Amino acid sequence: TAAVREEVKLCPSVTKLYYADGQGKTDKAIADIKGMVAKGVNALVYFPDAGKAMLPALRAAYKAGVVTVPYRVTPGGTPGKDYTMFVGTDFQLAGKNWGEWIKKNVPAGGNILMLSGPAGNSQGTEERKGLEASLAGTDYKFIGANPFEATGWDPGKSQEVLTAAIAKYPKIDVIVSDFGPSLVSALDAAQKTG
């Protein structure tokens, strides 16, 4: 948020900046959006990590006249109808790049466990598509939930999910995570199990 505050200083038309953190809880994130609209904000830039579950709240903000810009993870819907515009990231490309790295560093193939944020988020779903495209026709196999094991990008939940996966799958060769801090905290569980 410090970087955002610095950027806002460069824009004289922004007179007040509010910040909210849904803390990985969809109901809190929805309440935060509603609260911002109730405060009378003119614009809302929002990371809808819960994906399509956020669309009704974003649509309501847009219909209330708030410039509404979700970014990175798509909430579904249509720009100009459900929100002002969407600023995206090419997550499939990220997944393809990870796949190339995996082929180079684990060339014999193996079992891949993928961790991502909340269930249904477009980031993890698109990254998985990119991974699958990159690894097609190879000896790699995805294990765990499809498209990924949901962690909510929460370090504690990531540790819980990884511990359960280690107990369930005796051989995990590659762990893919799209949120480093979450994975780092979970690696202690992996080390303890050998």
Question: Over which residues does each language-model region extend?
Answer:
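A residue-level marker of the well-folded mature domains of exported/periplasmic proteins
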Residues: 1-194
